[in-house]
């Protein structure tokens, strides 16, 4: 019934009459506008742009960075944006990780720390992928709670970027800075495993390196950056520096007055490994100061008087002097031994012979066999008193033997003492002769040095 009532209420098509002109205008308004040959920006972007890389980290750390940048000056924020845009260039190759047990969710995973998904890596059980985004975000949030600056780069990029190694070093402005600093010990910060050198930046006050050569004005760093163009001059400089140190160590041969003049006037020459003799004008300066390159031979250095260095020991100590010294020491030691042995024989000759004869006679007369023979010849009975006297004599004989043994040991000690005395006297004589010879040799060297100095500087 309701349907019938609705049908009755609706007007019929035959009852409604619309003019043809109005119908045409209405249909034209319903038609879509004609398509322009120029495509819209959204369509062009979707058709032209290739598939982009997977997105970076999407966490609250970007918000913290935005807040920090907003507090800074607009110039610094503009520079920061320029640096990030230059560092994230598509030409930069992504490193591949080799994680085994970390699931690529730790900071020592290079892909995870850089904010990119693993793609073509050699990792095992990897969770740094788009399929595991939930676990990835949980790991990121946990790391940021412990350290809000965990995903910041260690080295702030330089707006100048990486320069060509063959370019002039003075024109390269290295503004980057390591946030934690390097800890090099033996490389001099000139190897690839130094993070500052690898990023082409100079070491800063944050670094804890030892014997650092990665500073502004370092000759070693310039030689590495320039490559083969400066290798010859660098070798030449290092040779001159080594020779200068060696010559300075030998300055004790000169008196104090000549040392000062030597450091000012006399410059040294050395034959390098290439067979060319070089001269130096000034000492090598440190801490990045410009050092003079040594000039080839037969070229005068402006502003300094040059002369070839000649040691004062030249033509002073010859091999025959060594032979003479050795023969002198040996002959003197033999003479000392003969003299002391002759003196000992003369002192012990008289009393020793007398003592020997007396000892033999006493031993014969005081022997118990002799006493028994005398008693047998008498063949008389021995009284107790005589027996007591005989016992006393036996004790005396034993004491005399002990004294004779003591005399023998004392004589042996005297012999050893005399031999040690001979050795001591020989040592004393040899040392005194050697000392006198060294004094004589030093006097010769001093005289020779004065002659060389007078010949080189006649004024």
UniProtKB/Swiss-Prot annotation:
A Pfam family hit: TCR
InterPro entries: CRC (IPR005172), Lin-54_fam (IPR028307), Tesmin/TSO1-like_CXC (IPR033467)
Domain of life assignment: Eukaryota
Subcellular location: Nucleus
GO cellular component: nucleus
Protein name: Protein tesmin/TSO1-like CXC 7
Lineage: Eukaryota, Viridiplantae, Streptophyta, Embryophyta, Tracheophyta
Basic and acidic residues bias locations: 79-89, 340-349, 395-413
One Gene Ontology molecular-function label: metal ion binding
Keywords for the protein's UniProt record, in alphabetical order: Developmental protein, Metal-binding, Nucleus, Zinc
Family per record: Belongs to the lin-54 family.
Domain remark from Swiss-Prot or TrEMBL: The cysteine-rich domain CRC binds zinc in vitro.
């Amino acid at each position: 019934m309701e349907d019938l009532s609705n049908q009755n209420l609706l007007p019929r098509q035959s009852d409604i009459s619309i003019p043809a002109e109005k119908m045409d205008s209405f249909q034209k308004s319903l038609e879509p506008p004609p398509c322009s040959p120029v495509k819209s920006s959204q369509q062009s972007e979707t058709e032209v742009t290739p598939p982009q890389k997977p997105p970076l980290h999407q966490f609250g750390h970007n918000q913290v960075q935005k807040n920090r940048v907003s507090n800074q000056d607009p110039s610094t924020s503009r520079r920061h944006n320029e640096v990030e845009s230059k560092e994230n260039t598509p030409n930069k190759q992504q490193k591949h990780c080799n994680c085994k047990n970390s699931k690529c969710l730790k900071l020592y995973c290079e892909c995870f720390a850089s904010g990119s998904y693993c793609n073509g890596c050699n990792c095992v059980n990897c969770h740094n992928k788009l399929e595991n985004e939930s676990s990835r975000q949980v790991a990121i949030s946990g790391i940021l709670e412990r350290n809000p600056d965990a995903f910041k780069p260690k080295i702030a990029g330089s707006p100048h970027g990486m320069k060509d190694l063959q370019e002039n070093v003075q024109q390269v402005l290295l503004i980057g800075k390591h946030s934690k600093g390097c800890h090099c010990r033996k490389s001099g910060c000139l190897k690839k495993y130094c993070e500052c050198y690898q990023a082409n930046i100079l070491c800063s006050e944050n670094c804890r390196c030892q014997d650092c050569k990665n500073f502004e004005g370092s000759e070693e760093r310039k030689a590495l950056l320039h490559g083969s163009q400066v290798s010859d001059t660098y070798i030449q400089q290092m040779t001159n520096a080594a020779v200068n140190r060696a010559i300075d160590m030998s300055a004790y041969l000169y008196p104090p007055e000549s040392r000062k003049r030597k450091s000012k006037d006399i410059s040294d020459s050395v034959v390098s490994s290439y067979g060319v003799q070089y001269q130096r004008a000034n000492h090598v300066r440190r801490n990045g100061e410009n050092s003079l390159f040594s000039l080839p031979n037969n070229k005068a250095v402006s502003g300094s008087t040059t002369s070839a260095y000649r040691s004062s020991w030249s033509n002073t100590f010859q091999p025959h002097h060594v032979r003479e010294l050795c023969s002198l020491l040996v002959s003197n030691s033999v003479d000392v031994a003969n003299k002391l042995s002759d003196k000992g024989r003369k002192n012990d000759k008289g009393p020793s012979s007398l003592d020997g004869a007396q000892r033999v006679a006493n031993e014969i007369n005081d022997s118990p066999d002799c006493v028994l023979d005398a008693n047998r010849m008498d063949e008389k009975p021995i009284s107790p008193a005589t027996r007591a006297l005989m016992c006393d004599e036996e004790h005396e004989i034993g004491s005399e033997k002990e004294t004779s043994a003591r005399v023998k040991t004392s004589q042996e000690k005297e012999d050893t003492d005399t031999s040690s005395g001979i050795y001591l006297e020989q040592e004393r004589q040899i040392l005194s002769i050697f000392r006198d010879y060294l004094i004589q040799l030093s006097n010769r060297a001093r005289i020779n040095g004065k002659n060389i100095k007078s010949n080189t500087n006649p004024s």
